[in-house]
Amino acid sequence: MGKIFFYEERNFQGRHYECGSDYSDLSSYFNRCNSIRVEGGNWILYEHPSYKGNQYYLWKGEYPDFQRWMGFNDSIRSCRFLPNYQGQYKMRIYERGDYQGQMMEFFDDCPNTYERFNFHDIHSCNVFDGHWMFYEEPNYRGRQYYLRPGEYRRYNDWGASSPRIGSFRRVYHRF
């Protein structure tokens, strides 16, 4: 079972809240989030309620300030516990929206999309198996986007404001 602790101050100080499941609105439990301790499971955190805004992928460990989870500010307002997935991973990406243009199929991580297939704009994708994270920059940096099995006809379907994806990786449990 997963468990995550949110702290209002850096270095695990101040008011805190313990969470063990999905919450669509954490606003009533704390005003800001400057440090996090994950004691179990993998989590996706969201900047705004209802799983909106910037997304952050965290696993077991300590995050003494929001820069450690690549946060842009101290706002965490919703969270999702990621289910344990043991199967295969499969995803198709497309260089244009609505599954048009060049298509590539992936079963593993890609630290640099430009080096791998000479473009870094992904306009649509289809996740068949597994859970994946897209990153705006190479080497798993920049804004993050969580994708679970399903169809993503346009980049805004996964929460992005542009099609730029510099890297992606499979979400697997890091207990």
Curated annotation (Swiss-Prot):
Residues 2-40, 41-83, 89-129, 130-172 form the Beta/gamma crystallin 'Greek key' domain. It comes from the Eukaryota. PROSITE patterns: CRYSTALLIN_BETA_GAMMA (PS50915). GO terms for molecular function: structural constituent of eye lens. Has a two-domain beta-structure, folded into four very similar Greek key motifs. Belongs to the beta/gamma-crystallin family. Monomer. This is Gamma-crystallin-1. It comes from Xenopus laevis (African clawed frog). The lineage of its organism: Eukaryota, Metazoa, Chordata, Craniata, Vertebrata.
